[in-house]
Amino acid sequence: MVRSNLLAGCLLLAAPFARAQEGVASGTITDSHGEAVAYCTVSLRRTADSTVVTGVVSDTLGRYRLAPLSEESCFLEFAHVAYETALRAVPPGREAFVCDVVLQPANNRIDEVTVLSRFVERRAGRYTVSLVGNPLARDRLLNDLLVLLPGMRQEQNRTFKINGREIRQIYIDDRPATADELKALPAESVKTVEIQRFASSDQEIAARGAVLRITLRPLADGGYRGTAMSWLCMRDNGFSNTGFQFPLTMRYGRFNLYNQLSYSYFEELHEYTRQADYDDEALAIRSTETERTDHHTFTDRLNLVWEVTPHHRLGLTGGFSYASSVPDLVSSSLHYPSGASLPAAGSSFASHGELDNHIWQATASYRWLRDEEGSQLKADFDYVDFASDKRYRYDEQTEGAPSAVTTESQHPRNRLFLAETSFTEVLNEHLTLQAGGEYYWRDIRRRTLTAEDGSPSGLSTFRYRGNGAAVYGDAELSLDWFELVGGVRMQWDRVDHFTGGDTRWRRRDYWRLCPNVNATFILEQERGTTLDLAYTRDGSYIPYDMLSPLRIRESEFRYTVGNPELTPSRGYDLDAVLTLRERWTLSYTYSRGEDMIERMTFTDPDDPQQSYEQPVNCSTMGKHMLSLSYAGPLTKWWRVNWELYGTRGFYRYAGITHRVQSGGIYLSNSLQFAPGFGMTVQFSLESPYEHPGRRHNAMHNLGATLYKYLCKNRLYLNLEARCLLQNDNVNWMWSVTDGYRSCQRHRSRRSFIFTAAYFFNNYKGKRDIQRTQTLQKITNEYR
């Protein structure tokens, strides 16, 4: 009995050591460009009959670990839908077998029915799509690929939305970018696309919202990547616009160089018919207006990043933009007494303007990459100087009255300095902390000189000085089935402004605290089924561009004016998003706002025929938004992104509660007839909707794009037709304080755009390209 117990004890003690002798296979899986291949199936198979002994799937870094190894003769199989299957023999008797594998792209074309979840990683409030080896990226520009992702759509004004929420910020390798820049990027040159649905604490309060982050494929020493793109657009009644883009990225030694050169010439044409009724004056005025503006815009941005050491990087950016425009407006009007069928008088109005904008921008940045897990220290400093000269001439002629000529000269000047620093600490694979701070300083000067019939009649000035600071913090918890991000931002803003005629500067201080919480429940990892919940407290920006009470002439009977009494609005959003198998998306949002800024219409008490718009803190808003979308393939050659959405809520203003509701559909269809040859068809329909003091008619629009790749996918040709089926845009506006109301009809025009692009690149490796993060966008004024 003693011997039996002793033998059993020896066997128990020996078991862990026997387990330790079992073989383990591990390694990293990459592609021919050195990129990690995620979600690759690694199978251990018997040599005799190829039956599977065990298997694993590689992680997002391409790593795998497979145990235990069989004592029989076996081999490893590496299978991925985008690559050729690789086989590696396992040496018998090995305790530790390290096998790194480089997969080659699949020679056969992968059908669009590939499961998207293989390339998607979901985190709290955001998801990342890997485009390396992704069949969606083949023969597409990035602009065309984005609208095929779950919940995404592109509006007619070329902006993007995710689940009905506008994407307010776009970054390409940390650099703020515009939607137009995305059309010059082949999707296959992009490493990852990250879509952040909800706000985070590092966002300025006014800019909190959805974010799109693009990470380009890396280059090594001597590598380069560029696009030469040009386009020509014609309307159905003549020329519209032309231009070119030339982005270029290079790496030389420890230096990364990026340059974005662009030019555009745009002939903007708008045709309006208006009818304004003045009940208090017993008068109606009917007008036809033609507004034509010629724009010239030249922009160049040069960025240089120096990798001082593998962990320390310095960046410098210089940017310049010059824009000129010539706006012309011609209007003719007929004046009808109330109830009369014949006009009692007529009038004409013409305006001519000449505008020149100069913008200079300088940015410096520092990065300390503390470890390979993502811990880092960031510091950015940004300065922008904007100067403009605007000259206007207004000619007015009314029957029975002498003609009048008024000239205006405006000289706005804006300067902005912004500094930001943040620290990210990855404690372990489950917990990440982030903290940071910001400071800004802004100075705006606007001066208007007015002359009537050649004699100076007035000088108006407006000054604005603002500065503010913010601190914020985030914590991210990551588990296998659950992701949670919680953060808070505290921001202080000081506003000082002065208008000519005031006896002193006006000052206001604002303190705001905005928390945010995002949670993601991963219901089915392999099938891509998740549930996202979010709460975001936010507020509007300091309305510095709406404070000036100086008049800006719009047409013969309209002008706009600011409001020095404006304050930022405040509110919150509640969101829930259910994603089923990376294809179906059901989204719900409830938004609540207080002191909302609305542009209200009033009549001038000194001249009742003149109406003006003025922003006012006047409304309380509550709105429910619901959308259902499907993004996926219908056949091997037809992929769609369809969305049905609707809103219902209320606006409370001027003591009146007004119920509003609207809905619409969005249909995006991507057709691929052959490799490198395809077509995109988009259709949208939106019901009428209403806001305080205005109402919009129902709108529908149909557009189509035909594209072809030539010369081994280096030459890209595109023909796009916009507004093939679109009705006129009709707006009704009224005053809530008097008897003024008007109706404006904007005539829609078809347009056709031909685009040609040449792509050239030489990646030569896998070192990441870094760019200085500019904190501000360059924005020109054309009016």
Label the model's feature ranges.
Residues 142, 148, 175-200, 246:
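Short acidic/polar hinge/loop motifs at secondary-structure boundaries
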